[in-house]
Amino acid sequence: MKKIYLDNAATTPVSPEILAAMEPYFTNKFGNASEPHFWGQEARKAIDEAREKIANFLGAKPKEIIFTSCATESINLAHKGLIESIKYQVSSIKYPHIITSRVEHKAVLETCKHLEKIGWVKVTYLPVDKYGIVDIKDIRQAIRPETVLVSIMYTNNEVGTIEPIGKIGRLIKEINVSRVACHLSPVYFHTDATQAIQYLDCNVDGLGIDLLSFSGHKLYAPKGIGALYIRSGVPFVRQQDGGGQEYNLRAGTENVPYIVALGKAIELVEQNKVHSTKCIEKLKSKLIDGVLKISGVKLVGHPTNQAPHIATFIVEGAEGEAMLLLLSDKGIAASSGSACTSGLLKPSHVLTAMGYKPQEAHGSLRFSLGKDTTLKEIDYVVKVLPEVIKKLRKMAPKLI
């Protein structure tokens, strides 16, 4: 049976080049980077080189890059580190105010909810339009004297919509000019760039970003490594106590092989971005054309402001999880916006925020392409999917 992996927005396989770069740091180059001897110096050099690669890619300084275990930790660190610092350093702000959107990754939404629950912050959750895009005007109107953080994802992981990050960055920069004149705390801008960093411009100065999170396992590096960019001057308190690693902002012995992997992943992104993006866009276009020939299927997300690798559909008369199981039987791995939680099938919070009814959201199907996706694989999916949908639609009346 053919095996076709179209769930690259969930995770990617580790590339051979990255695995080869990591391997020496599991065996011969095993030193602790905090030690002054040869092995420690060797490990420290590897970390410094990886940090510099990532900093150069983002247009940042090496000391502004903090290594974490994943994007979720990076997001938690960004929000909690900033809020705790402001809460205890700016006495005039009793409840720091965060602005985010209803379509963020759960790492952002649950972190904000936690900070609300413990009484540290007030949060505004902005609506989105039918494409999943936040209105710049809504951000402007939501900003108040206590606002300290705007956190909007760069590219949505479920539907691929690209948010107007550059425009948001310029808006915040403009607002901060007047806030400084009024002796108010600046508003800082965080973005979750996990789905964007492989394909889109992530220059932090050009976009006006103060904090940026991403993960390695979406870049063909292993699970267990991520990073947080923190602009110099952003108030910040570490959330993990211990040694002074990561510029005293994230304690713990550095995971050298995985840091090397992340540096190598970014190096490969920089080398291959243009070619890879063009190839994936062509394959995605063919996939969309083929899938939309099926009756009762519609494409979700913005028609043009869209990540090159994600294509999400809503299929009338077919449930997402059931489609995944039947596709898996055919050797195809995909994803759905619905997730099984506590025995109850809950519709995607992203799709419902975009205005889709729960029943529609349950019929979502996401294909996410990668560098190894081929034309033959797309042709096979386009051939098999109509059969799967037809089978489920025939079964549907019997299940009611």
Residue ranges and their predicted role:
Residues M1-I400:
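Pyridoxal 5′-phosphate
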